[in-house]
């Protein structure tokens, strides 16, 4: 419905200038017109009495409606109607009781069906209208002006009108259905409301007979059943039996009852204080019901006011928590003035479980699988040898070490006591491997809870870009990232609500972790990534899935239960692309079900379906090292075959000839059954062309591997230059000026200077398709993934042999005089250029 149409329909026709003046917002006519409201809208728009012109009144109304003033009081109003209906029934005012009951049913049905946003919009309007109607109820109606639906629509935006009309139509429909339900109430004895009605009648009879104890018990049963019916929807009726069982033992199950009946769209977790408040509120409502039956009106009113106050406080707390889950967070107003941060404080208690219950814990001996899982117990802490001690890369001979062997040493440190050769023969890309230790401090230098807090304070991290907030509940995984910077109060607020925190690329902020990644990338010859996962107790942040990487899960703090499954399809083994989220029913029996404690390591190949859950009273902080992504033969062939085909097409005219005219009539899925001679001839011809022209040569394979290695140079982390290396590289060089102002460097190369590459894989010599020769390197890469364009140096073809000699000689040093170049000056010039780009290191530091 268009806004103009609404305004025109609402504006009265004729020559009544006074009435038109009211719509135009003027106040010339002292006698304010009486604008009636349609009876069908009486429940939605009650008469409001405000001061000022008609335009000012409506603007005042909507300025208050759309303020973030707190939670809706719809249920409170509905509760009052039910109490009033019951009181009218006691006074034999059947007609009034029936009317109030219809209104209650309509409001309740509306609560159950409208969306959260529509519900919030409608409830704010209804609550404000009810508030003003109550304040002005004692004044004379003849002296007050009324605001009709037409006035409201005049000042609504198009979006507000759409919401208003949807809710209005829905309420009218609910009222009609509620009327039918009320007419058939007494005859439908198989539904819960009939039993509730009978209990209330019995309670009234008992009250008249002065059977106070029995009346109170009947009233409690009535309220419990009614509340249960009001809070569940059709799709949740299967929970009714559970709710009734909890109601039977209310004193013990009050907290559980609040969990079952709370179906808000925000985070489902709630604090113990909130649960206790709900229990106390429920008891007050029961007491108010009993007081009404005993005609203690004053006491009943006091209990009802306490109940409303408790509901308002509880809803305010829920709203504050929910605001963190929105894509856009905005400040809220306190007392209509000062802005308050909508973030949850760090000191909030931990939330309840957010996870979808995985299969029950079973005896590992009972798990039967074709995959062989090997668990290794590391030696006791007192028997640790040097291999298990904290990794250290700085030695007196660091400048002489081999970076590839250093990477192997780090692998050995991670998987100790398993030897690397044994690991790569029996585990790598084959099956999972679990190493359990008794030393919880084994990986403590890499990261900690405190380090994460410092990162949030000292660095500018953005949600989604650097940090994710996730949750997995009721079989559904959600990402709750707001926009903007991830400040500590917001992050720890999410964590307190039971959400998991994933920090992307923590090695950019933690030198120790970055050192591990840079050394490992030398060994694996590929990008090595690290992600951090922090999960609160009794929670799960991610759905079951598999990844396209070889994963090393390093448990740093706390404990976490891991369940691994075989891929559902054979084609998913050693998967090249990560999967989507699996439902629990799609998975078979886990091939491993173990709890990782601090110091433990779990390895599993790509394609292994996995999920992880924290235990009660135990948080978890772990790092996942990801290696060997997109490093398969398939990736090589994807790079190689287009190159081979292009070269073959340029060389062979047979590949450039057109297809026979009858090709489309004999080849294709529709012609598989046609076993004619021309079809077979075409198939054999294509196969011969592939065999003859598309077999890659050794040079083709070298060129394709160079292209893959060039990609690694772009993705790799820059090397960490240790202090003993710094004085031998350009990073330790210093320059000054002489008396004439000329630049003077503190280094100078000659033919006797010994040099070598800084790292084994610091550069890649690539001959491009156009014939140019380039040196790609990652010495100047950023800490973020592919932050800059690839770095390269273009050299002369005859200078490539000098670079090749440096590559083959690593890790040994060569004198510049040994470089295969024609002149000594050219040898020194090439070595100096490579050193100044951070690619070479001298054997002795410059003085």
From Swiss-Prot:
Family named by the database record: Belongs to the ROX family. NO66 subfamily.
An individual GO BP term: negative regulation of DNA-templated transcription
EC code: 1.14.11.-, 1.14.11.27
Modified residues (Phosphothreonine): 329
Enzyme class: oxidoreductase
Positions of post-translational Phosphoserine modification: 323, 330
Catalytic activity: N(6),N(6)-dimethyl-L-lysyl(36)-[histone H3] + 2 2-oxoglutarate + 2 O2 = L-lysyl(36)-[histone H3] + 2 formaldehyde + 2 succinate + 2 CO2
Domain of life: Eukaryota
Cysteine-cysteine disulfides: none
Record's function text: Oxygenase that can act as both a histone lysine demethylase and a ribosomal histidine hydroxylase. Specifically demethylates 'Lys-4' (H3K4me) and 'Lys-36' (H3K36me) of histone H3, thereby playing a central role in histone code.
Necessary cofactors: Fe(2+)
Low complexity bias spans: 268-278
Cofactor details (free text): Binds 1 Fe(2+) ion per subunit.
InterPro entries hit by this protein: JmjC_dom (IPR003347), NO66-like (IPR039994), RIOX1/NO66-like_C_WH (IPR049043)
Protein name: Bifunctional lysine-specific demethylase and histidyl-hydroxylase NO66
Binding site for Fe cation: 545, 547, 610
Compartments, as annotated in UniProt: Nucleus
Ranges of compositional bias, category Polar residues: 1-24, 304-314
């Amino acid at each position: 419905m268009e806004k103009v149409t609404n305004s025109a329909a609402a504006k009265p026709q004729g020559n009544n200038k006074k009435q038109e003046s009211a719509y135009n917002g003027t106040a010339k006519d002292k006698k304010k017109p009486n604008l009636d409201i349609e009876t069908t809208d009486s429940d939605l728009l009650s008469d409001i009495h405000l001061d000022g012109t008609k335009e000012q009144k409506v603007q005042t109304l909507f300025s208050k409606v759309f303020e973030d003033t707190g939670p809706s009081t719809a249920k409170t109003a509905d509760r009052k109607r039910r109490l009033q209906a019951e009181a009218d029934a006691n006074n034999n005012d059947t007609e009034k009781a029936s009317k109030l009951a219809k209104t209650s049913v309509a409001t309740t049905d509306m609560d159950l069906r409208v969306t959260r946003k529509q519900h919030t919009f409608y409830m704010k309007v209804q609550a404000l209208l009810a508030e003003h109607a109550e304040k002005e109820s004692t004044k004379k109606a003849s002296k007050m002006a009324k605001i009709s639906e037409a006035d409201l629509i005049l000042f609504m935006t198009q979006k507000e009108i759409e919401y208003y009309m949807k809710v209005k139509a829905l309420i009218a429909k609910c009222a009609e259905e509620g009327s039918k339900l009320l007419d058939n109430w007494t005859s439908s004895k198989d539904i819960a409301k009939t039993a509730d009605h009978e209990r209330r009648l019995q309670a009234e009879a008992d009250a008249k007979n002065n059977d106070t104890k029995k009346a109170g018990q009947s009233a409690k049963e009535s309220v419990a059943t009614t509340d249960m019916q009001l809070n569940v929807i059709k799709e949740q009726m299967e929970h009714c039996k559970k709710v009734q069982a909890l109601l039977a033992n209310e004193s013990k199950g009050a907290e559980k009852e609040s969990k079952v009946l709370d179906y808000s769209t925000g985070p489902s977790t709630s604090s113990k204080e909130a649960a206790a408040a709900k229990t106390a509120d429920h008891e007050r409502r029961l007491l108010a019901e009993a007081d009404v039956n005993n005609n203690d009106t004053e006491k009943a009113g006091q209990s009802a006011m306490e109940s409303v106050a408790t509901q308002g406080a509880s809803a305010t707390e829920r709203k504050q928590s929910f605001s963190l889950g929105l894509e856009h967070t905005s400040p809220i107003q306190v007392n209509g003035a000062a802005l308050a941060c909508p973030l949850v404080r760090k000191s909030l208690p931990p939330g309840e479980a957010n996870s979808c219950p995985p299969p029950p814990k079973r005896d590992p001996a009972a798990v039967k699988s074709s995959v062989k899982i090997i668990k290794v117990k590391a030696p006791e802490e007192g028997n640790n040898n040097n291999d298990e001690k904290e990794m250290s890369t700085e030695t007196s001979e660091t400048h002489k070490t081999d970076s590839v062997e250093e990477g192997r040493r780090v692998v050995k440190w991670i998987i100790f006591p398993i030897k690397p050769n044994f690991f790569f023969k029996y585990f790598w890309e084959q099956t999972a491997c679990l190493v359990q230790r008794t030393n919880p401090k084994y990986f403590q230098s890499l990261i900690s809870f405190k380090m994460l807090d410092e990162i949030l304070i000292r660095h500018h991290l953005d949600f989604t870009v650097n940090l994710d907030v996730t949750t997995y509940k009721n079989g559904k995984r959600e990402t709750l990232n707001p926009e903007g910077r991830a400040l500590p109060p917001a992050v720890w607020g999410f964590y307190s609500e039971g959400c998991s925190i994933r920090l992307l690329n923590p090695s950019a902020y933690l030198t120790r972790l970055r050192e591990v990644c840079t050394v490992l990338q030398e060994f694996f010859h590929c990008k090595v990534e690290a992600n951090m996962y922090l999960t609160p107790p009794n929670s799960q942040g991610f759905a079951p899935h598999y990844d396209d990487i070889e994963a090393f899960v390093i448990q740093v703090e706390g404990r976490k239960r891991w369940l691994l499954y075989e891929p559902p399809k054979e084609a998913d083994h050693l998967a090249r692309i990560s999967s989507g989220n699996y439902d629990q029913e799609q998975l078979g029996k886990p091939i491993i079900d173990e709890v990782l404690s601090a110091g433990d390591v779990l390895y599993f190949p790509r394609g292994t379906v996995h999920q992880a859950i924290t235990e009660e009273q135990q948080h978890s902080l772990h790092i996942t090292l990801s290696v060997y992504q997109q490093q398969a033969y398939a990736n090589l062939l994807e790079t190689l075959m287009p190159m081979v085909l292009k070269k073959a097409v340029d060389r062979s005219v047979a590949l450039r000839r057109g297809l026979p005219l009858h090709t489309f009539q004999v080849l294709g899925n529709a012609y598989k059954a046609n076993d004619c001679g021309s079809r077979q001839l075409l198939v054999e011809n294509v196969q011969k062309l592939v065999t003859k022209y598309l077999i890659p040569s050794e040079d083709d394979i070298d060129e394709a591997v160079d292209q893959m290695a060039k990609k690694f140079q772009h993705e790799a982390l820059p090397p960490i230059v240790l202090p003993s290396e710094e004085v031998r590289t350009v990073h330790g060089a210093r320059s000054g000026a002489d008396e004439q102002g000329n630049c003077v460097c503190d280094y100078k190369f000659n033919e006797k200077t010994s040099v070598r590459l800084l790292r084994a894989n610091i550069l890649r010599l690539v001959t491009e398709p156009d014939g140019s020769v380039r040196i790609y390197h990652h010495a100047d890469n950023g800490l973020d993934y592919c932050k800059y364009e690839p770095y390269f140096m273009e050299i002369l073809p005859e200078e490539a042999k000098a670079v090749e000699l440096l590559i083959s000689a690593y890790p040994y040093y060569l004198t510049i005089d040994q470089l295969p170049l024609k002149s000594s000056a050219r040898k020194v010039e090439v070595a100096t250029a490579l050193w100044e780009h951070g690619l070479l290191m001298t054997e002795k530091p410059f003085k």
